């Protein structure tokens, strides 16, 4: 059975994944699927670095603005949504291009993980109930002991990741469902960090503070509020930090997030990384995609 070919672009935040995805979509008749756990939420545009209206006009985007901020979203939800999007895109003769930085979501899709099938649901439920009795600290210690590093740490995601780790054989299909070309973008650490600092400054100038304040005042405890880009500004609203201090924390946490992203993809997935500073970029990637699409 022939597997559908898809392009997957990964890399740390602020490295230029969105721009490359749009360029490849234009060059190879593609449509973009967001692989970011936060971009599913409506009204959260700036802090999630969502493709702008102008960028979305250049290429069709899927899995953006599909949930209200009050709703939860998981790797399981993403896999179901992404599969439907891929099927839709392919049915119209176009190329699916996944762009994102949420490692667990992409791994779940590409390696065929699922919560169901042959897995004994009673066994899964028993393990889940056992995890629910643990404190947050105990959960995170268990994650660390198993070498699991999450893009964003919260209780729900910690439990889901431990389930995935515990039942890996039962949760993994016999065969990966797609034929992906993995494209990783990177650069020197100092360059990425400088790009992050500049992006945060631009976000603040574009209205991030107002977006974060709305989330803080309306929905401070929802899953969406725990994403990097929002919670770092909450201490400012609470009078516990100056705006300068909160902004500095946001930059620092985003830099740490970028480092974790790179570590995840290098350790968990077979990705060839290209430096965006190389003279061959992006032509070398265009050539690789062209060869990939011509392969039987």
From Swiss-Prot:
Residues at which substrate binds = 13-18
Q: Which residues bind ATP?
A: 11-18
The molecule here is called tRNA dimethylallyltransferase
Q: Which organism is it from?
A: Streptococcus equi subsp. zooepidemicus (strain H70)
Q: Where is this site: Interaction with substrate tRNA?
A: 102, 128
Record keywords, A-Z: ATP-binding, Magnesium, Nucleotide-binding, Transferase, tRNA processing
The UniProt entry's sequence similarity note says: Belongs to the IPP transferase family.
The molecular function terms of the Gene Ontology recorded here are: ATP binding; tRNA dimethylallyltransferase activity
Q: Which cofactor does it need?
A: Mg(2+)
Q: How does it assemble?
A: Monomer.
* Recorded name of the encoding gene: miaA
């Amino acid at each position: 059975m022939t597997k559908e070919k898809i392009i997957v672009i990964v890399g740390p935040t602020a490295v230029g994944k969105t721009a490359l995805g749009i360029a490849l979509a234009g060059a190879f008749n593609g449509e973009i699927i967001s692989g970011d756990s936060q971009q599913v939420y409506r009204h959260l545009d700036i802090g999630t670095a969502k493709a702008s209206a102008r960028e979305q006009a250049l290429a069709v985007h899927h899995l953006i603005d599909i949930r209200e901020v009050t709703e939860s979203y998981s790797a399981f939800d993403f896999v179901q949504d992404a599969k439907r999007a891929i099927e839709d895109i392919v049915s119209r003769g176009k190329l699916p291009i996944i762009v994102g930085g949420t490692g667990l979501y992409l791994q779940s899709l590409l390696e065929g993980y699922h919560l169901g099938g042959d897995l004994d649901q009673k066994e899964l439920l028993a393990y889940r109930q056992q995890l629910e009795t643990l404190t947050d600290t105990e959960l995170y210690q268990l994650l660390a002991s198993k070498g699991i590093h999450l893009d964003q740490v919260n209780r729900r995601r910690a439990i889901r990741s431990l389930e995935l780790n515990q039942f890996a054989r039962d949760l993994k299909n016999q065969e990966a469902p797609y034929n992906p070309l993995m494209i990783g973008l990177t650069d020197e650490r100092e360059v990425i960090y400088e790009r992050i600092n500049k992006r945060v400054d631009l976000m603040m100038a574009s209205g991030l503070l107002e977006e974060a304040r709305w989330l803080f005042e309306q929905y401070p405890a929802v899953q969406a509020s725990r994403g990097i880009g929002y919670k770092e500004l909450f201490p400012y609203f609470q009078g516990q930090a100056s705006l300068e201090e909160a902004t500095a924390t946001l930059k620092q946490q985003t830099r740490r997030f970028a480092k974790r992203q790179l570590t995840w993809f290098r350790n968990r997935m077979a990705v060839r990384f290209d430096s965006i500073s190389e003279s061959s970029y992006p032509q070398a990637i265009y050539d690789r995609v062209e060869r990939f699409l011509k392969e039987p």
